[in-house]
């Protein structure tokens, strides 16, 4: 069996409220465990609308049919009214995910804020964002948070340095090919990174593949992956608008010798065996703006 890390990003209030119960039921049915990363603070995702002025983001929204894919309430959240606090109202679903045997970590306090402002926040502001997120998630889970994955893969060496204070077992902050130990700004070795290696639905539909062909496309990408495959889904997509399509994918992979697992299951017993690398800012196909990407050293 080819082991593939399955990462579930939970970005929004509605994605938590509606997408989590759907995915928990589907994963239980197919006997799958995954790593869930929750946004826990205010849902301000509608404030991304200003990015429509950027041609690359506008094209991404058009080709993925974003209004249908996400729903208008998600696209407008936190614009004309204050964003709802996700963990405050829906923390029980985060605990339910943990109790179902899945790995649970922090995605963000304010997902939209992190994507839009991380590059200009001070070190103190970055620290506060992570701290608020950790505290809210720990309150919901009633146990320490041991892993994290920053919103939108917006991470660089400065972000990694800030996150060292929280002593996570691993982070999944970047795109790349295989787990590694990041070299930090001060020359020290940071917390293990488990990069996402495979494209997400919204990165390739409308450019590389048609919607109806996506499942076979991602299976082919998994088979071609020569590193340590990690696949990201979103509750707002695979847990809602594309739930039926995603369940078809799970049925297909059962016949392809592919097994999904939590990200921590991809790590060796001795993490000192992992190679070193860096996380650097880079453009990425299908995404607007910079992402954190793995670089060999």
UniProtKB/Swiss-Prot annotation:
Query: Which top EC class applies here?
Result: hydrolase
Q: Print the keywords alphabetically.
A: Antibiotic resistance, Hydrolase, Lipid A biosynthesis, Lipid biosynthesis, Lipid metabolism, Lipopolysaccharide biosynthesis
Q: Which CDD domains does its entry note?
A: CE4_ArnD
Q: Does the record carry Lipid metabolism as a key word?
A: yes
Looking up InterPro entries in the UniProt record yields: ArnD (IPR023557), Glyco_hydro/deAcase_b/a-brl (IPR011330), NODB_dom (IPR002509), Polysacc_deacetylase_ArnD (IPR050248)
Task: Read off the NCBIfam families from this record.
Answer: PRK15394.1
Q: What is this protein called?
A: Probable 4-deoxy-4-formamido-L-arabinose-phosphoundecaprenol deformylase ArnD
This protein's gene is called arnD
């Amino acid at each position: 069996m080819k082991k593939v890390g399955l990462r579930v990003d939970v970005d929004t209030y509605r994605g938590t409220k509606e997408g989590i119960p759907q995915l928990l039921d589907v994963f239980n049915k197919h006997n799958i465990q995954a790593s869930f990363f929750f946004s826990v603070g205010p849902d301000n995702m509608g404030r991304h609308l200003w990015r429509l002025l950027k041609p690359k983001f506008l094209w991404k929204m058009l080709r993925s049919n974003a209004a249908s894919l996400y729903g208008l309430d998600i696209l407008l959240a936190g614009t004309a009214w204050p964003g709802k606090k996700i963990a405050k109202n829906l923390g029980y679903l985060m605990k339910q995910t943990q109790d179902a045997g899945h790995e649970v970590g922090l995605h963000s306090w304010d997902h939209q804020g992190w994507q839009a402002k991380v590059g200009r926040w001070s070190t103190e502001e970055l620290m506060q964002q992570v701290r608020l997120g950790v505290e809210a998630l720990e309150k919901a889970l009633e146990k320490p948070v041991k892993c994290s994955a920053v919103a939108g893969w917006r991470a660089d060496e400065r972000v990694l340095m800030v996150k060292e204070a929280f002593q996570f077992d691993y982070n999944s902050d970047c795109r790349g090919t295989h787990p590694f130990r990041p070299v930090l700004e001060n020359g020290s070795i940071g917390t293990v990174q488990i990069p996402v290696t495979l494209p997400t639905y919204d990165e390739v539909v409308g450019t590389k593949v048609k919607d109806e062909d996506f499942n076979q496309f991602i299976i082919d990408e998994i088979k071609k992956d020569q590193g340590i495959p990690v696949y990201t889904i979103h509750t707002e997509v695979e847990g809602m608008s594309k739930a039926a399509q995603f369940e078809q994918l799970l049925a297909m992979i059962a016949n392809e010798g592919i097994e999904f697992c939590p990200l921590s299951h991809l790590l060796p017993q001795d993490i000192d065996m992992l190679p070193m690398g860096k996380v650097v800012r880079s453009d990425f196909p299908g995404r607007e703006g910079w992402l954190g990407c793995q670089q060999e050293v």
